[in-house]
Amino acid sequence: MNSPVFYDHFERHAHGAGLKGHSTHYCPGCGHGIVHRDLADAIGELGLQDRTVLISPVGCAVFAHYYFDVGNSQAAHGRAPAVALGHKLANPDAIVISYQGDGDLASIGLAETISTAQLGLPITVIFINNAIYGMTGGQCAPTSLIGQKTTTSPAGRDRAMGSPLRVAELIAQLDGPIYVERVALFDPKQRVKARRAIQKALRLQAEGRGYAFIEVLAECPTHLKLTPELAEAWVRDQMVPVFPLGVKKDLTVEPWFHCGPPSYDVEKFLALVGAEPLEPDTEPPVPATSAIGDLSLKFAGAGGDGAQTAALLLTRAAIDAGFDATHIPSYGPESRGGTSYADVHIAAGEVLNPAAPEPDILVAFNAPSLAKFAPMVAPEGTILYDGGVITQLPALPAGCRVIAVPFTEIARGLGRPVAKNMVAIGALQGATGLLPPDRFTITLRHLLKDKPSLLPLNEAAFEAGRRAVCPPSVPT
Amino acid sequence: MSHFTTARPRPFLDPAYCKACLRCVEACAKHCITPGSTLNTITGVAPVELHLEHCTGCALCVQACPEPFGLRLDEGMSHLEGEFRLEDPTKLFGKKRVDVVDAPIEPDEQIPLPGCAPLVLKGAYASAIGAVLAGCRHVFGYPITPSTEGAELMAKLMPELGGTFVQAVSEVAAVNMMYGAGGAGVPAMTFTSSPGFSLMLEGISYMIGAEVPGVFVNFMRGGPGLGNIAPEQSDIKLACRGLGHGNTHALVLAPSTPQEMLDLTLAAFALSFRYRNPVIMLGDGFLGQMTGVVRLPPTLSRPGRPAWAVWGDRSHRHNLISSIHLAETDLEAHNEHLNRKYAAIAKRETRAELFRCDDAEVLVVACNTPARMAKGAVEVARARGLAAGLFRPITLWPFPIDALLPLLPRTRQIIVVEASPGQLEDELRLALSHADRVPPPITHVRRGGGVLPQQTEILAQIAATQEAFA
């Protein structure tokens, strides 16, 4: 009886017509067939048929799904380990096998091979090394031997074409894998070892212990242009000296891999994204005024001035008050030092254009920012700047309202120069009446609900900024 | 058979399945197997011949045979030798236990969410939260500006929600992890930006070919090459016309607000599973960074398990995820199936926003962030008495031509506004051409390199057009 892990009829092989319904597509004497049988037997003997997902590569084994009666996925060239990882993470109970040849695993997919091995999640990689490209017709493989003639090394592989890659050794020296062995098929003794290695690799996965890698030195009689018997001898005499057989790594590891199950818990989700359920009959906030058609602001300073935080606070406060509002930062390398600026829009209806190329209000924290953006301020706009930092005024557009407030000095007076952005927000509120002052404090308290110790300073800075443009004697 | 020394099963061979590789010949220590001398009339090769007088039942020949139906151990079937019929394997082997039951489709479940205060979120975060709401618990990615915020938030959220975030070795690996997870039937996604999206195209072609769902959020940046990290819209061509090799298409969604980043990401997963096809979210660099008001939907999804998934259990065991169809007619039929799917998407899933289009003579066509500048320009133009409107395609592929055609009789001028050298305009012109419509004159406002079209220049173009009419 053939293994029950093979289909009774190879329906996917040319629709199972004629001989193809029970014959593989492999050439006579090919090592793939033997490894297929070993793998099928191992899956069957370990009782894993209903859990197995086999990833077939690009290469001669591309049609492994013709034969194996398990879940099958066929991957792009070299990407089988990444596909295998996707399957394992989707269903950690699945037994996932990445079955690959030397071109797939050791050439085009080397990055996926190494990174997946180093990750060490419990999957099984079966690597068929026959020192040649089979499917494309006998080209040089990363594992072809020095001197080996192939269609792309017609004079024999030489040093300039690189030396054969010893993959099992490469994988074994990584931290991720727990079991790495190189086996062969050239005589009955080797075939017994190969069967055992494949079975052990699968068992380690089934037990959740870790990543195992089995390199199989296999025969490609067709492209070696040898009879199967001579191909076996070639593997034994030519390949084995370059690719020594044996266990390269075998660690005893306790089962460690866990992931999931996925959670769809509503309360957990809301807490994670910071969403706060409303009382059932809560009416959405309504903008206090519709006078704000679409107001645009630009906050500009050096990195560390807090322009972004100030802009975000304003955005949030406006949204909390029922307005539509947007914030766009300058970003990228610029946001990691150098200038930093932010565009804010506030509208009673919908913010149409979120950019502020001609801001109604400019808040500038330093001289370069003021010089850069002041000329763009809309006619009859407002320019608010740190009067303590900026002492030399550039030419400012006529018709603008210009207000200097020493943000930094005031903040320093409160003991924390970094609070200058809150001083600026206070000054902005005081100078423009943009949103009632308590909207800012409500939002501020909300934002700092997990860091209440920071609240007094920020509130004080906000108030100090307001007072600097709006003395207490003048009603707000 | 009384001369057999043990009761162990002996090898058995159906000659039609012997390829005469002779590996069994040298495997047998007792020289029981010899190269054949008679050609098999079906296969044209001479199968090996078994002489089992000295056979010990060691099975080493069986282990040497590369063919599943080649040498096997005879467990009571030797009487069938010579009588085997290719046409009827069940007669030979008996009817195999049928493990494959009709795969149950576990349906998606919608779990109600309470009404919540609006969130204030960056576009990239809004998209990530949209994915979480869609039930996505598998995120694969590679850091690239300006998309990293999405991945960073997912790296935080996924472990808390029993999900997985993997920072892959490359975008190439990331898309293939999506192929694996998507092939297992779970919602998977990535955040990327233009150069990373280029690297993912191979995998996207495989996903489309193998009908694997998955959502790609691409915050387009300046190109070609390394370009820069400022916003552009120059992957429109790639997403609409160039999703890897072969006959590929995917729904391309173009949000223009943080709210739409959430809403369309949420919709993208449903569409991706409905059609078993990837869905591409094209944002621009601005949109990922833009903070705005975002309201949560009324439900959170718990995804089910599709019948076609390669899950790794009995009921899904017969499934296959593959894009290979070796026979020419098979591949042709597969592509015809894909074409019918593309046609169904084009018929059912196009979306557009029409802003003040009803009596518009000048139609501005724009998407993503430039559409917001265009909206501002239209609003100002209207205030000045100019009959302008904005046609904003939300699906770029398929282009929402059916929503546009009724506007054309009144339209005297189309102005395409985009942060690319004409890629949106090409989509528009192609859609008009397929609809056999001669459009009104088309002009454009195009910026690039990270410079977005500004409201003032759009407005100036509208005004100039209107002057020309007068």
Regions inferred by a protein language model and the residue ranges of each:
Chain B
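Peripheral docking tails and interdomain loops at the edges
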Residues: 418-470
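Redox- and metal-dependent alpha/beta enzyme cores, enriched for Fe-S-associated oxidoreductases
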Residues: 351-387, 391, 397-404
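Conformationally flexible catalytic loops at phosphate/diphosphate-handling active centers
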Residues: 276-354
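Glycine-/acidic-rich phosphate or pyrophosphate-binding loops and their flanking alpha/beta elements
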Residues: 107, 122-127, 339-362, 375, ...
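Conserved thiamine diphosphate
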Residues: 230-284, 454
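Thiamine diphosphate
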Residues: 79-81, 93-242, 249, 456-460
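Iron-sulfur cluster-binding cysteine motifs and their immediate structural context
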Residues: 23-43, 60-79
